[in-house]
From Swiss-Prot:
It comes from the Eukaryota. It comes from Arabidopsis thaliana. This is Pentatricopeptide repeat-containing protein At1g80270, mitochondrial. GO terms for cellular component: chloroplast envelope; mitochondrion. Keywords: Mitochondrion, Repeat, Transit peptide.
Length: 596
């Protein structure tokens, strides 16, 4: 029997016996639709606890271990695991970094959510573009339906295989808006008989483009007969991706009420959630998995590897890898890449390169799937020779993701001209490059503070008819912040927020909020804090830390800050507690004591 919680205890990095339950039995989401409890017959499995009961499980199971550490050790653990900001990635992490190395609910969606025909996706993922995909990409942004009508009139046949190819290729390029328009057109024109998987894909795309609330509205319109486990799994994954704890717990409990068996996927989603929000609760989920005899999946191990690596606990990460070996779990390319990234981030160059050589195998050409990660990680190690070696192999006929990885890699190596040359090649080959292509080069300009080139690139992007998506806005906003033009970045944020098709990335707000915080500009820091809520982002410790720092830098009393934290169900870690003490308006000093 596996015991990952024991592995975590051996590394002495998780406080398993002291996790406090904060979930309510009756979670009410104000102003939101409730989920239809009659959508599927319920066969209750009482052995599976609801999510608000999970924390008490760990307290009972490990009560003897609670309180065995000193208060100082407890604080250190809490500070090290409760927030990603305390890790080596720090506050300066960008969205591109996340795309490269971190696990997310979106990263595993093709494999885990099962939204696309599995046999089709595996065979066609690296093949040439489908004709349906080409038609959709070449059409103006809001005219996908007209383009598809014309395509059918020309005698082309719409088949499941062609749809699956196009959908997969659109998703891989993050063209979610076009994919959603295709899905809606297919149903409206009765080109396919809709299945639960089709509706789940629609739900997933709706949330990605229009937000979680619109996704819930979409779910209400889906026929009850199609509201099965796949649909709820998709909703759960999107609640997790949004970092919405209450809604994630609500869906988790709803799945239990509907009689769906507790699965590895469901537990993995809760692990992903707590990896971002409250790492102390990771132990609770692992204990639940042990109690219900749910064997960890490959994603479970990846999450734990990422948690350990992000907090620079390399010995703990290696123990997780050893456990995988003992359990006979084979490392895939993604797990190897994740491990190599954390070795690189910890400055363990030799260990990182050893893993990369294992990824290459005996025949590098035969391991084409690894090229994207190899380019990125070799660049992070400063190995220009290795980046050029890998790129030379695929340069004549590169896959799209390899080209993007090469642009990033050469950018990291300060080879901006090489990055620009690859970009131009993509534009020439595709004729109509996607927003993600522009965003990657734009981020290279951001990293090198090339404001003028960045502006020209965005102008060129707009002239090409390519829609400016969230990743592009994120890079552009950061570009202005890095150039010291914070007010201009704030203006861009306002403009981007008004685009109904775009949900801005959390980092886009934080770049500006951090700058206002450094200035001690309480008014504008509070304004960005409010904008994040309006955009649908739930408050996290990270935002409150920036907000509190603004009050400290302004030497202004932060009245009611503890109550605000409590209202958002956020518990301060060690660094936040120090900020609260520093900014306490009722703080006693030696002089005040004398005056009293």
């Amino acid at each position: 029997m596996f015991a990952l919680s024991k592995v975590l205890r051996r590394t002495q990095r998780l406080r398993l016996g002291a996790c406090s339950a904060v979930f309510s039995k009756d979670i009410q989401l104000g102003g939101e639709r409730s989920f239809d409890s009659n959508s599927i017959a319920s066969t209750k499995r009482e052995a599976v606890p609801r999510f608000y009961e999970i924390s008490s499980l760990s307290n009972r199971a490990l009560s003897s271990s609670a309180g065995t550490k000193s208060d100082q050790e407890e604080d250190d653990l809490e500070d090290g695991f409760s927030e990603l900001e305390g890790s080596k990635s720090g506050q300066g992490s960008t969205s591109s970094d996340e795309d490269e190395g971190k696990l997310s609910a979106d990263e595993e969606e093709e494999e885990e959510l099962d939204l696309i025909e599995t046999d089709v996706s595996r065979k066609t993922v690296e093949k040439k573009q489908s004709e349906l995909f080409k038609t959709i990409v070449s059409a103006p942004g809001l005219s996908i339906g007209s383009a598809l009508d014309k395509w059918v009139e020309e005698g082309n046949e719409i088949t499941r295989v062609e749809i699956a190819k196009a959908m997969l290729q659109l998703r891989r390029r993050r063209m979610y808006g076009r994919a959603l328009q295709m899905s809606e057109w297919l149903e409206a024109n009765k080109k396919i008989e809709m299945t639960e998987r089709d509706y789940a894909s629609r739900l997933d795309l709706t949330v990605k483009i229009r937000g979680l609330e619109k996704g819930e509205a979409c779910m209400q319109k889906i026929p009850k007969s199609f509201k099965g486990e796949v649909l709820y799994r998709t909703l759960l994954a999107n609640c997790v991706a949004a970092g919405n704890v209450k809604k994630s717990e609500l869906v988790f409990n709803k799945m239990k009420d509907l009689g769906f068996p507790l699965s590895g996927f469901t537990c993995d989603q809760m692990l992903l959630l707590h990896k971002r929000i409250d790492r102390k609760k990771i132990a609770d989920v692992l204990l639940l998995m042990e109690k219900e005899n749910i064997k960890p999946s490959l994603l479970t191990y990846k999450i734990l590897i990422d948690v350990k690596g992000a907090t620079n606990d390399i010995s703990g990460m290696e123990q997780i890898l050893e456990t995988m070996k003992d359990e006979g779990v084979e490392l895939d390319f993604q797990t190897q890449a994740l491990t190599a990234r954390h070795y690189s981030g910890a400055g363990l160059k030799d260990k990182a390169e050893k893993v990369l050589k294992e990824m290459e195998g005996e025949s590098l050409e035969a391991n084409r799937r690894a090229f994207k990660d190899l380019l990125s990680i070799y660049a992070s190690l400063g190995r220009e020779d290795e980046v050029k070696r890998i790129w030379k192999i695929c340069e004549s006929k590169p896959y799209f993701e390899e080209s993007l990885a090469a642009i990033q890699a050469f950018g990291k190596l300060n080879k901006v001209q090489e990055a620009e040359a690859i970009f131009e090649k993509i534009v020439k080959m595709d004729r109509r490059a996607s927003s993600s292509t522009y965003s990657v080069l734009l981020r290279v300009y951001v990293d090198h503070k090339m404001l003028s080139k960045g502006k020209d690139l965005v102008k060129r992007m707009a002239e090409s008819g390519c829609r400016i998506e969230a990743t592009t806005w994120d890079a552009l906003i950061k570009l202005y912040v890095e150039a010291g033009e914070v007010e201009k970045a704030d203006s861009l944020l306002d403009k981007a927020s008004k685009q109904s098709h775009t949900k801005l990335m959390m980092n886009s707000f934080m770049y500006i909020m951090d700058e206002y915080s450094k200035r001690g500009d309480v008014h504008n820091t509070e304004k960005i804090f409010l904008k994040m809520r309006e955009a649908g982002y739930t408050s996290r410790l990270r935002q409150f830390q920036a907000l509190m720092q603004a009050y400290i830098n302004a030497k202004s009393p932060a009245y009611g800050m503890r109550d605000r934290l409590k209202a958002d169900n956020i518990f301060p870690n060690k660094s936040m507690a120090a900020q609260l003490a520093q900014g306490d308006p009722f703080k006693k000093t030696a002089i005040s004591d004398i005056l009293d």
